[in-house]
Amino acid sequence: MRKIILASGSPRRKELLELAGVPFEIIVSEVEETIGAYSSPSDIVMSLALQKASAVAENNSDHIVLGADTIVTYESRILGKPSNEAEAKEMLQLLSGKTHEVYTGVAIIAKDKTVTFYERTEVTFWELTEEEIDAYIASKEPLDKAGSYGIQGKGSIFVQHIQGDYYSVVGLPISRLVRELKQFNIDVTHA
């Protein structure tokens, strides 16, 4: 039987696959992510997810490889992972009291088929005080997350409203993924 391989070292993606009962192994993609001239955030996340999955699939062609990528956007500006605490603070100040978009792209590669898709979720933050932002940054939680927050952690207290898939904001639209895996004859709903 073909194995499912997650081409990511993200603990959040690992947890979501485990939560859904998807059997998998992890092989972290070492690909250098490159963003070309793309017209939309959805194109970017699907391309990056495909780059990650393709790099792992090269040496695992008999298996199904999953790649994923998440970005946060606000007014056409892409907010990736902050490079330092000052950048994290700038991002959180930018998002304070506003609605932003989170895009997660997924690529599923097998020998006979490749599927890519994305989910877009709108997230609205409460107005944040400087003290709230500074305390959150001091926790170190935002430093490895796109947009400088983790909706599944302490960053959850900043969220006023969400429209779309919560799990996509965490890093993997698990409900959609499980449905897409059926195209590869993988059905975890009966496991």
From Swiss-Prot:
One of its GO terms (molecular function) is dTTP diphosphatase activity. The active site is at D69. Keywords: Cytoplasm, Hydrolase, Nucleotide metabolism. It catalyses: dTTP + H2O = dTMP + diphosphate + H(+); UTP + H2O = UMP + diphosphate + H(+). Its EC number is 3.6.1.9. GO terms for biological process: nucleotide metabolic process. Its cofactor is a divalent metal cation. The record marks R12, T70, Q152 as: Important for substrate specificity. Nucleoside triphosphate pyrophosphatase that hydrolyzes dTTP and UTP. May have a dual role in cell division arrest and in preventing the incorporation of modified nucleotides into cellular nucleic acids. This is dTTP/UTP pyrophosphatase. It comes from Bacillus cereus (strain ZK / E33L). The lineage of its organism: Bacteria, Bacillati, Bacillota, Bacilli, Bacillales.
